[in-house]
């Protein structure tokens, strides 16, 4: 006998969304919203833009590796989620102090190109978008790693949406974060 829960995306207090499998789906949703805004505003870009969503990030970045090899980008801005460390059982000394509702998290780390990160920070400051900074001492654990080390190296950056209760059926994200994330992109 197999028992499953019937679930759906729910809104909490008009501030948060909660549901299952928001990890990675939120990144895909955000980039889809960016494309929608570009289309609605009839925005013409001075460069080619590939908007992709990958598979198998949790088990080895396989989709991102294939995409990076196929399109050979000059720049990659990856959207994903990160742990809200204000949830129970997080050691902020190890994981940093990242909180849902306080802005998207921009990551420093070996896979992140400093000039691209500086551009994201300056853009957020100019547009008065709140953000948080986090560090990755080795791997980011996201598709950023696949892009950064592909081909001959790709300038990469990571914008993460803080998510409570990752890898559970009640993953929770801030609605205002989601909109700020889209605006920064």
Indicate where each model-derived feature is located.
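Metal-dependent peptidase/peptidase-like ectodomains
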Residues: 59-132
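Acidic, glycine-rich active-site loops and adjacent beta-strand->loop/helix elements
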Residues: 9, 52-60, 81-83, 138, ...
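Catalytic-core environment of secreted peptidases
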Residues: 1-29
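Conserved small/polar residues in nucleotide/adenosyl-binding loops
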Residues: 176-183
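Alpha-helical metal-binding/catalytic segments enriched in His/Glu/Asp
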Residues: 18-58
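Short glycine-rich, acidic/polar surface loops and turns
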Residues: 138-158
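Flexible, glycine/charged-enriched surface loops at secondary-structure junctions
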Residues: 41-49, 128-137, 185
């Amino acid at each position: 006998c197999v028992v499953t829960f019937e679930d759906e995306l729910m809104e909490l207090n008009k501030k948060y969304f909660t549901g299952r499998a928001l990890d990675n789906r939120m990144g895909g949703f955000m980039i889809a919203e960016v494309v929608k805004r570009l289309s609605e505003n009839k925005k013409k870009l001075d460069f080619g833009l590939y908007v992709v969503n990958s598979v198998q990030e949790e088990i080895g970045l396989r989709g991102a590796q294939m995409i990076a090899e196929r399109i050979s980008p000059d720049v990659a801005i990856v959207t994903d989620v990160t742990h809200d460390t204000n949830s129970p059982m997080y050691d902020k000394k190890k994981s940093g102090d990242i909180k849902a509702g306080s802005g998207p998290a921009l990551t420093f780390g070996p896979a992140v190109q400093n000039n691209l990160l500086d551009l994201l920070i300056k853009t957020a400051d100019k547009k008065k978008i709140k953000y948080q900074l986090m560090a990755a001492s080795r791997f980011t654990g996201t598709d950023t790693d696949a892009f950064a080390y592909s081909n001959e190296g790709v300038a990469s950056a990571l914008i993460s949406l803080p998510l409570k209760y990752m890898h559970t059926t009640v993953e929770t994200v801030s609605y205002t974060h989601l909109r700020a994330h889209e605006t920064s992109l």
